[in-house]
From Swiss-Prot:
Signal peptide: 1-25
Record keywords: Cleavage on pair of basic residues, Disulfide bond, Nematocyst, Neurotoxin, Secreted, Signal, Toxin
Domain of life: Eukaryota
An example Gene Ontology CC term for this record: extracellular region
Annotated ShKT domain residues: 39-78
Tissue expression per record: Expressed in nematocytes (in planulae and primary polyps). Is localized predominantly in the body column nematocytes and not in the tentacles (in primary polyps).
Function, in words: Neurotoxin. In vivo, induces contraction paralysis followed by death (within 2 hours) on zebrafish larvae. Also induces body contraction in Nematostella 11-dpf polyps.
Name under which the protein is recorded: Neurotoxin ShK-like1
């Protein structure tokens, strides 16, 4: 049973890596600016969504705690 669990965890990890690489396609110079400003996204494919600023302002949203933890240092988002 532990092999099945390990396989599921590996698939989920690879899916998250692939998703973050696919949607975080920033131009090279923009990436440098973000690094210089110390913007850190734990999950860029989540933090770049258009509805994130609205969630940051709404403490009653069901995903508020998760978004604030993951996207706290996102430039222009939950700062």
């Amino acid at each position: 049973m532990s092999r099945k669990l390990l396989a599921v965890l590996m698939v989920c990890t690879f899916f998250l890596i692939a998703a973050s690489m696919g949607t975080n396609a920033l131009p090279f110079h923009e990436g440098i600016e973000r690094r210089a400003a110390k913007c850190v996204d734990k999950m860029p494919f989540v933090c770049m969504r258009k509805d994130i600023p609205a969630i940051c302002k709404n403490r009653n949203h069901r995903s508020y705690a998760f978004i604030m933890d993951v996207c706290r240092k996102t430039c222009g988002q939950c700062t």
